[in-house]
C-alpha cells in the first residue's frame, strides 16, 4: 500500500518524520510525506523529511510562531492557504498513491484545527481514500487540550473516510520524562501503523504466500467511523543459529519468547493465540471490541511459520467476537 502522509502540527510532523525514517531504513519506498505547520521551529526540528517537504503556513497571521493552541485560528489559516498545501502535495507526485493519511495531535492548535479542513479538500480533489490518525492528549495536559480534541475529533470523523485514534492516556508510564514518553508513544504509532500501511507491498524477500493487499485494507475501512489497532509479536528462536526472528500479528503487539519451533497443530494454535493477545491486549484506543462492525487480521513472518489453518481459525475467532461479520485477512 503506497501512502502519502501529511503531518499537521508538531505531533503530526514528528510522527511522519519517523515514518519516513522507517521507510528509508527498510528501503521499501512505500511512504512519502510532507509536514505542515505554523511554527518554524517545529519544522526545523525534523530530521528525515526533506526541507522542500516542510511547509510553513500562516506567516502573515502568526509570523512563524504557531497559533498558540487556538484551533479556530489553525482552521482559518489552513483554509486561507489550502491551495498552497494542495500544490505542495501534488508536486510530490500522487499518481501511484493508494491513500492519503493525515496525522495530527488533536489537542493543539494547528493540527486539530487544520486537519478536518485539509481532509475535506483532499476528498474533493482526489479519488483515493483520506484517512486520519488523531492523537488524543492525556487529561493531565489540561482542559484546553481536551476541549480542542473533543471539538476537532467530532469534525474530523465526519470529514475523513476513516479515523484512527491513538490515546496517549492509555499508553503513559508513571515516572517517565516528557521527552521519553513522547518518543516512546510516537515509536508505538509508527510500529503499529507501519505494518498496516505496508500491506500488499513487495519486500526484498519477494511476494509472500498469503498476501493482504491494499484493496482489503481500504474495503475494511470503508464506511467511515473510528478505528483502533492492536499489535502482538511472538519471537521464533532458531535452534541452530540461536537467533530470534519476529512473527508479527498485524493489527497488534506484545513480546513473548518461545524456545521451540512449532509444527502442525501447534503452529495453528500459536497464530490463534497471537491474534487473541493482539485483540485482547492494549489497543491504540481502548474500547469494547465486541461492538466493532468490521475487522482485519494481518500476519507477517517467516513462511515456515505461516499456517493457513491457523490464519483461517484466527479470522473465525475475530468474527465470532465482534458485532459485524466482515473480517478480512
List the predicted regions and their residue ranges.
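Tubulin/FtsZ superfamily GTPase core signature
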Residues: 1-329
